[in-house]
Amino acid sequence: MSVKPETETGTAQTAAAEAPEEGVYSFAAMEAKWPQVWEDLKVFTPADDGSRERRYVLDMFPYPSGDLHMGHAEAFAMGDVVARYLRQKGFDVLHPIGWDSFGLPAENAAIKRNAHPSEWTYANIDTQAASFKRYAISADWSRRLHTSDPEYYRWTQWLFKRFYERGLAYRKDSPVNWCPKDLTVLANEQVVNGACERCGTPVTKKSLNQWYFKITDYADRLLEDMDQLQGHWPERVLAMQRNWIGRSEGAHVRFVIEATADRAEREVTVFTTRPDTLYGATFFVVAADAHLALDLVTPEQHDELMAYREKVKALSEIERQSTEREKTGVFTGRYAINPLNGEKLPVWAADYVLADYGTGAIMAVPAHDQRDLDFAKTFGLPVRAVLDTGDEDPAETGVATAGEGTLKNSGELDGLSKSEGIPAAIEILEKLGTGEKFVNFRLRDWLLSRQRFWGTPIPIIHCGECGEVPVPDDQLPVRLPDDLRGEALSPKGTSPLAAAVEWVNVECPNCGRAAQRDTDTMDTFVDSSWYFLRFVSPDYTEGPFDPEKINNWMPVGQYVGGVEHAILHLLYARFFTKVIKDIGLIEANEPFSALLNQGQVLNGGKAMSKSLGNGVDLGEQLDKFGVDAVRLTMVFASPPEDDVDWADVSPSGSAKFLARAWRLGQDVSSEPGVDPATGDRALRTVTHKTIADAAELLDNNKFNVVVARLMELVNATRKTIDSGAGAADPAVREAVEAVAVILSLFAPYTAEDLWNTLGHPASVANAGWPKHDDALLVQDTVTAVVQVQGKVRDRLEVSPDITEDALRELALASENVQRALDGRGIRTVIVRAPKLVNIVPA
């Protein structure tokens, strides 16, 4: 059952329509009553007038693939706690919502349904929007946006043009990751274990002319600026990004490729982290699928190379780099000259070297690199050890040696250690003019072309006379055509937009001659790399965002979303932010000051999936237990970064607690505004300690512990009402009002109703965080539990400083204890002052 707002025929609305009995907790009645009140009061719309300090809280916006699921329920409950807490603390909070609404699933659905992707997309958005409203997310709905709206992607195209003008968007021919099922290109980050991240099909290589963003120009800054995020982002996310960027210090070494009868001499540069091992190079390898291989191969070897390249196309990157696979390759007929010793090295083309990493060529040192050694063994190439590590000769063992050691067989480098040999080798290369120190990165430029329809069109026109011509700003957005739908969108290996002849054929903006639009669309990660900026002023028409407002809100103070976005979205968003800053449009250097990764929602220890049949329908859970009970369960079940196993939690238990908390309001008999100072001291101490503890815990995202403290306060308040000072005590009102405010972060419907019952106008969301009194945090007494033979027989209020002897005396004097002993003697008394006395009868 899907998550739906209450309707006239819905179960929840029907229950709400029947007025609940007085004093009966009805989540359905509350869910029917309060949403319209919140909307009318614009409770969650920030003033944005500078009257209060601003805070920006953002959840990673969803993709509209059907209705909300359990993962959405957890993630958005977490983000909402942060937004509601900051609002209670007096900040002007921006907490917007929108949809990442371009993408392949919509296109596939349109093909299946003979429809336009927008129909499926916006229908799902409407469904999810209604569900979010039922789920009581404290979002400012006036800022809602969708990346597939022309009003949004106009500015995505505008930003692309600014990148293009700075040389950060460019086209090149290169082997790219190709999904043979979706018939589209994939970025490196979208290939997981050699397969398409989306559909799981093994990825192949294909040579295409594609658009790229030059993210490598920002590699150093992306790496260095992580220092600003240390302690505010999860360490594992920072580690994943550092590894993906992959900074390596080493050297560029230039090898001369000898001329042949029909090939001129040329120079090829390689990057190596171990220039000290140059004397161990016994052959040279270029990526078989690189243009360099075609440039180098002799006519005699050409056909063999071409046949080999066809085989390489069918291999994934993971397969090509595997150490388990037998090495393959083709001799090019050429030789490279080692710049240090003049030795001729045969040049091979092989699949284990990648065209788009480094320069696409390597010097092979088989004694000290396992893949080089495996290749040498396969093709009978020499193996020369130049590093004495104390291990056996790799030529004999078949196991390469690496790491520390003393250089040998290395001319003037003999006897040097690794730390001495690397700078010495670089110095020699620099003197010879054949190399220099260089920093390389694993990170490669961001491939953004996609051969699909439902994405942002690339705002470039191709003219036979003028070449690439950006679409003028006043002609943006380049809108997607409306007349392509259904089967016309099916993947054919070229962009579906090519079939929209009237759309494609245009005049060149420069010369007026016949020209064609670019028919690729942008990777949808482009859309999500700047959406957080648009939320600041989503209706602004003079630019991507209002320059008068953007620096008031950015950077995002708290970003919430899954760790699966650690490399793709988060790295791209950081890149975009830095470029936009360099353009001079914003001051922020990083998009997200703090990051919270919520765990997964599992069922029976496994991720929910249709194939396993272990999915849990969120709508059914909401109908059965209520929104507040589900939200509270999500938050209380574990620390936010840990997984929640729905099989092990109890939304029914949460519902019972909420009913207990709500009933406190029915019992309070004092008037609003009564002075709590005259109230029960013990309850006031619990209340003020809860307020103080909750604030500190919330500041550290320990939401589950806050709920535990809240439960203790509810129990203490009930005890005071039933067996202590009574419902009229001012301390009871103070406690219940604190319960309502703290509860509003987790269970907004129940909290609002409780606040209303206490005589306050809506909304509790703006009540303000209660102030604690430090004097009340010092406990005058503590409760000592007295047990007789392991059973609790009495509780004594005693000084925190009571001695063991004094506590023993009080316990033995207790009438309840004497009654339990029933005249028996005492074998022993165990005292743990000030909390416990255990009496063991004789």
UniProtKB/Swiss-Prot annotation:
Keywords, ordered alphabetically? Aminoacyl-tRNA synthetase, ATP-binding, Cytoplasm, Ligase, Nucleotide-binding, Protein biosynthesis
Q: Which reaction does it catalyse?
A: tRNA(Leu) + L-leucine + ATP = L-leucyl-tRNA(Leu) + AMP + diphosphate
Region: Disordered; residue ranges are 390-414
Q: Which SUPFAM superfamilies match?
A: Anticodon-binding domain of a subclass of class I aminoacyl-tRNA synthetases (SSF47323), Nucleotidylyl transferase (SSF52374), ValRS/IleRS/LeuRS editing domain (SSF50677)
Residues that, per the record, bind ATP: 610
The name this protein carries in UniProt is Leucine--tRNA ligase
Instruction: Give the record's family classification.
Output: Belongs to the class-I aminoacyl-tRNA synthetase family.
